[in-house]
Amino acid sequence: MRLLPRLLLLLLLVFPATVLLRGGPGGSLAEAQDLSEDEETVEDSVIEDEDDEAEVEEDEPTDLAEDREEEDVSGEPEASPSADTTILFVKGEDFPANNIVRFLVGFTNKGTEDFIVESLDASFRYPQDYQFYIQNFTALPLNTIVPPQRQATFEYSFIPAEPMGGRPFGLVINLNYKDFNGNVFQDAVFNQTVTVIEREDGLDGQTIFMYMSLAGLGLLVVVGLHQLLESRNRKRPIQKVEMGTSSQNDVDMSWIPQETLNQINKASPRRLPRKRPQKRSVGSDE
């Protein structure tokens, strides 16, 4: 009798545990509810992803349109179809460093309205990236009106920097103009890669300095040799030899006063040469 209450208590504890472990009706219901909830969340996430993709697809055309509008606004103006331009380099397409380069730009108005040519500019740019400026030359203001079916010619000149010699650069020459309606145009008259030639003719500063140094060195050598010869000549004195006159008749006495000459003659009278006696030969007549 004492064991019966204990068995009942044990059954009461073990039965619920076995029901929970085996997944009784309540457990299966909970699992079913969980599965249905998971399926609903998956379907909701799929629907949300599809909505996001649809929104992205709808936004892409608008973004492309905005990008195109920004490019149109920020892009440089183009040339007008009613105008033609030509270019002619005066000395050919040679670009010597530190020397003037001249060219002529011709503008032809083929339209029915006037064009106002505003300016002409040129620049050297990096060959791999034309957005990077190497040397930007001064823009030439023109402000010239070109009527329809008329032509105009403009001259421009620039000097490439001396350190740029022997290297390639992108040369860009732009002609800026507009019509009477205010539409701005820009024509890239020349847009190519050129090579700046090192200047060979003429004398640069280094060459002139070298020649001046050589001339000064040569002058110092000449002066040193001259001084050396003079010092040697001074060490050897010249022996003076007194040269007398062969006779008194060769002496000019006109510059001596007459009184002095008289005194000299009295003090040392001249001696006449003695006549030598002639020897008579034997048998000569007396």
Curated annotation (Swiss-Prot):
Location relative to the cell: Endoplasmic reticulum membrane
Modified residues (Phosphoserine): 247, 268
Keyword RNA-binding: no
Residues spanning the membrane: 208-228
Cytoplasmic side: 229-286
Ranges of compositional bias, category Acidic residues: 34-75
Disulfide-bonded cysteines: none
Signal peptide: 1-21
Biased amino acid composition, Basic residues: 268-279
GO cellular component: endoplasmic reticulum membrane
Sites bearing Phosphothreonine, chain numbering: 260
Domain of life per record: Eukaryota
Presence of the UniProt keyword Glycoprotein in the record: yes
Membrane disposition: Single-pass type I membrane protein
Region called Disordered, residue ranges: 28-83, 264-286
Keyword line: Calcium, Endoplasmic reticulum, Glycoprotein, Membrane, Phosphoprotein, Signal, Transmembrane, Transmembrane helix
Pfam family, one: TRAP_alpha
Record topological domains on the Lumenal side: 22-207
Further facts: Seems to bind calcium.
Stated family: Belongs to the TRAP-alpha family.
Free-text comment about domains: Shows a remarkable charge distribution with the N-terminus being highly negatively charged, and the cytoplasmic C-terminus positively charged.
Subunit (UniProt): Heterotetramer of TRAP-alpha, TRAP-beta, TRAP-delta and TRAP-gamma. Interacts with palmitoylated calnexin (CALX), the interaction is required for efficient folding of glycosylated proteins.
Stated role: TRAP proteins are part of a complex whose function is to bind calcium to the ER membrane and thereby regulate the retention of ER resident proteins. May be involved in the recycling of the translocation apparatus after completion of the translocation process or may function as a membrane-bound chaperone facilitating folding of translocated proteins.
Name this polypeptide is given: Translocon-associated protein subunit alpha
Native source species: Oryctolagus cuniculus (Rabbit)
Gene that encodes the chain: SSR1
